[in-house]
Every structure is written in structure tokens, then in C-alpha cells.
Amino acid sequence: MQAKAKIQVNTNQVGKDKINPYLFGHFVEDIRDHMDAMLAYPLSDMDFESNDVTYRGLSGSWRPFTNGKSTVFALEPAATYHSGHSQLIRIYSDDEAYAGIRQAIAVKEDQLGYELALYARASIEIKFLTAEIVDTASGEVLGATRIEIESHNWKQYASRIKVSRLCEQAEFRLYVPAEHERWRDNVSTGMLWLDHISLLPSDHVGLVRKEVVDMTKDLNAGMMRLAGNYISAYHWQQAIGPVNKRPCVINEAWGGWTNKYFGTDEFIEFCRDLQVEPLICVNDGSGTPEEAAEWVEYCNGGLDTPMGKLRAANGHVEPYGVKYWEIGNEVWGPWQVGHCSAEQFADRYVRFAQSMKGIDPEIKLLACGDDKQDWNRILLERAAEHMDYVTLHLYHGYNRFGMNDRTPKEERYKAILSYPEWTRESVRKVRELINSDSRYTHLKLAITEYNTMYYPNTIRKGLPNEHTLEAAAANAANLNEFIRNSDLIEIGSFSDLVNGWLGGCIRVGDFFADQFRGKSSGRTENALTVYGTPTYYVMNMYANRDLGYVVQSHTECGNFSVNSLVPTAPKLTDLPNLDVVACQSVDGDTLTIFMVNRSLENVVTEVLLDGFVTKGTARLLALTGEDADAFNNVHHPEAVVCEVFDVPVVNAQVSCELKASSVYVLEITRYKG
């Protein structure tokens, strides 16, 4: 028998709290390959920062490029003011050979030319270098340039390499060619040192891939958060000023190196390109209140302040005016630098808040909350007067139910689709705490990280569950819960924006399954393909609607229950197959109904409109796929995308069939005739 449902929308009953566009924000962090994928640089180990992992005297991703039998490679101290290493290449003229270094990369056609920057010094007999990009399969030189070496001392050089066509199995080479004039070998000849080599395509936008910027603009994010586990050991002054003078720093949260190229100034430029509000989380782990206050001053201070002067010296005269600041990222977790008790954090928070607001009293502060109310209770008792928002991180996966991949598939599916019920319970507990004391009622809630996370964020390979239509439907239903609680929840930050862990909704390249290794430059045949997961399209569908206030609605439909293997806090029986929320624009002229079919069968649905006069057609946005496991990849980047249809409105009623495990947005315009 065909499943049926009825949705009654009453536009005469409209909520009074406006839906904040920051609800649909996003999140960037230096985790695994997030920055490698987001930024436009094709090269790795640009400062020769990694150690010699091949035992050939070369740093990290670099490999020898020589046919000389006597060429020597070694890592030596970096150039003045630089960190990492410098790369020494010792060339013997009697070899009559070419000698240099190479690295696998992927490049696109660029007639304006990739920007090449490098530091070099050489013994006087080495007069020039060749830099080229080559198709490793055919040997075709896709572009080349000549660098004249002018000094035995360190000097910066710049050029452009025009690239004739796209090639995802390319190689960058920088070398002394065999055609170089000969010299008489001795202990001080044939010496070439290199330090900091970078390439950037001409279409980069503030160092970020143009494709990533374009896709992020389409998300209409409202707010962009800079945070994550790494921030608890992040010292902001190490990532400002000339990039070559920024130190290479170990990423204490995730291993490897922090990305020094995307610091405060680049983040603000990114936000301005997107026209979104920045949210910055400060380092309360290894950092100090004074350091956090100086960060506020760097962003917001005038030219009469020390940090304002420093910002201006770095090329940014006008203050950034960053309004939203977060103190503490998952400080309750033992994996976090600065992990502490609730009492310790509350006291620490007050010190940070007072220092930061001492610089700019107009900023809004977010305090690190927890899903465990004992933490929140102590935090609010000691620090509520110093905060504007309490934060929660709400990830949803099998661990909540004691399930794993051996649990029957349908049971796992139902568990994941119960995401909004878990969020409802978490929000309810915080709401009760806030309402329990008049000193707390000014507080709002910020969900600064959320997503499906099927398994713990540790080493794992296999199906990218977070990329599926199932995950998108769960995330959409969770967004519905955010909207239902928009009187309290004002900020949401989807985790993550690009690659990183499996949750990134914009994907660069075909790396997605290995949680541990991260990106290896040029390792695949599809390194330049940029596409969105189904959840990317959910975020796009929600954030680009004209939303003002929640409208009363009632849904009659079938239901399901979750057979959890462990006790659960929320009640997980008789859950509605359709998760629905209705909204009205501020001017009252547009009605938007978000509908998620959480069942595994199609549902014929009637939407009845009460108090909203319309005629003609409505617009139906649909995110569907062949089944719940449908996902996009580099070979089929648009297997699951949002489609738009016109549907008739007859007698204030819309009929539509909602496919299984799918997300729909019904948009209706008021008739004014």
C-alpha cells in the first residue's frame, strides 16, 4: 500500500523570533588535508620543512631530478628569517648532467601563468635554473621558465610558468640543465641552495582555489568559523606578516605541520570575499588571556594601538571589526591541549573574557559548553555574566546506539536518521538550564560543530558514509530542529567546509576514505576535480531561502522506531517518517516548507495551506538519489544534486511524492492580485 502523509501549514500562527542567517554557517580548520585541499598551492613541503623521509637528502615530498652519478642532496639550515630547511644540491660538472629536484603535482591550463616564487643562492659558476611543468605520462613540457641566478647570497626570485593544458599527473622540476657551461670541480663549486618554492595559479582568490571560493559563495554561509582542535595550541602571531618569515610549526592536534599560509589576514580576506561574518576561536589551551586580547586588538584596534599598527604594517590599515569570538574548543575532552575541569575552565574563561572585552567591549563571546549538563551548570554559575553564547558540538553516529557495520543495515539507517531527536534532547537540557536562573536568560546557543560522524574520528577506510544521501537527509532533519529552536539557537557551524575529515562538504580530488594519511600531492588521476557532497546541496538549499519566522505546521504520517543496543537519552519510538518545518519571510510574501522523508519508501504527500493565498505554481527543490547510499565522487560529481520543479497549487493545496531518504524544499509565493 502506498505510504501517504498530510502537512497542514497555518500561516496565521507565526513565531516572534527571527531566524538568524548565521544558523547556516560553516567551519574551516587545519585538520589533515583541509588546508591543502582548500588552498591553491599545488606543491607540498614548500619550505622543505619535513625531514628526509627517503634517506636521499631531500625533504618530504621532494624527489631527486638528475642523471648525474655524483650529484649530492642534503638538508641544511634555512635562509635568514626562514624556518624549515634549505635544500642543498651539489653538482659535479664532470658528470655533464642535469641536477635538481622534482615533485608530483596536478595543474590546470593557465595562459596567464602559475606564479613561481623561490629563494635561492649558488656558487658563482651556476648562472641560471630551469623551472618546468611536465606531463609525466607523455614527457610533454606543459610550461617552462628560466631563472637567472644573480647572487651567492640568498635572494628571492619570481617568474611565471604558462601551462598549456590541464594535467593531473604532472611534475614540477627545478634544476640546473645539462646545457649549462662547464666549470672545474673543487670543494666549493657546483653548490645550489633552495629555500621556499611555491606555485600559485593565476586565478587564486586570496590564496584559495577559485573553485572552492565559487562553491562556498553558493552556500551563502552567513558566518565562517576558524577553530578546531588545533586552535588550542595555535599562536596567531606565527601566521601573520610575510609568509616566508612565518615559522613552520607542528600541528599538535593532528600531526604534521600547521598551515602557515592561511592566517588571520587570509581568513578575513576569505570571509570578505564570501561576504560572511567571521567567528574566531582563540587559543585558551597553550595561550594566555593577553595573547587573546592582542588578537582582538590586531583585528579591531585603531592605528593608535600596538596591534593595530602591526596590522597596518602588514598591509591592512582599516580594522577588521571581528565581532564574534569563541573561547575554548572542546576543552572538556582529554584530546585537547589545555584540557581541564569545568571549574578550571570557568575561571580561565572569565580571565580571557575580561582581557578581550577590555580591548573591545562590543565583541560577542562564545563559551565552550558540553552536552553534559554538569559542565554547563558550573560554567554558567561562575561565568554567565561574561558570556553571550554557550556552545555545543553535536556529532551523530553509531556509537550512540552501540552499533557497528555488522548491525543490520535498516537498523543503522533508522539510527542515523534520528539525528534531530538527539539534538532536541541536547537543546532541551540547555534550555532548561538557561531558564532556571534569571542571570542566564540573556544567553543564546551556538552549535559550533555538527555533522553525522558514523564512526569515531580515528583511522578508518571504506565507504565515505558522511558523503551519502542518507547523511544528507540526517543533516537536513537536524537543520529542521535548529530552525524549530531558532529562538535559542542563533549560530550553526557545519563541520567541515573542505576535505579534512570525511565530513567536509566540498571535496577536492578523489581522496576521501583514509582518515589517517591525509592528502598526498598528485597521487590520483582526479586531483583537481572539485565537487559537493549531498550535504553540500542540503546546506545550499536551506541557506539560500528567504526565511524570517517559523510558522506553525502539523504533519500526519507513518512512523518508525530505533532499536538501539544501548540505553538512549531521547525517546526513539514512534518517530515521524517526515521531518517538517515551515517558515515565512519577514515580509510574509514567501512561505518555505522544509520536508525530509526519513523513511525507506516513497510518500505521497498533501500540503494544505491555511491563511496563505496563492495561485498558479510553487517551486519544489528536490535532493534525491537511487538509494540512501548514493553519493558523489570524482567520476560522477553530480550523481546527487538539487533539482528544481514547478508544481501546481490547487485550492491552497500542493500534492507531491517524496522519494525515500530524500530532502525537499517547497517554496510558495503569496498571491497579491
Residue ranges of predicted features:
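The substrate-binding groove and active-site-proximal loops of carbohydrate-active enzymes
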Residues: S198-G206, R246-K260, P278-S286, G328-A346, ...
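Noncatalytic carbohydrate-binding groove/subsite architecture in carbohydrate-active enzymes
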Residues: F172, P177-N186, G190, S341-L479, ...
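An active-site-proximal structural segment forming one wall of the substrate-binding cleft
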Residues: A170, P201-A221, F267, T288-Y324, ...
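Conserved, mostly hydrophobic/aromatic
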Residues: H26, L118, N220, C271, ...
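C-terminal beta-sandwich/jelly-roll accessory domains of carbohydrate-active enzymes
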Residues: G558-T573, V596-G673
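Extracellular and organelle-lumenal recognition/adhesion modules and their flexible linkers in secreted
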Residues: M1-K260, E277, G287, A293, ...
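Aromatic- and acidic-residue-enriched carbohydrate-binding clefts of CAZyme catalytic domains
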Residues: H26, S70-S86, Y230-T264, E269, ...
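Aromatic/acidic polysaccharide-binding cleft in carbohydrate-active enzymes
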Residues: D30-I31, L443-D579, D589
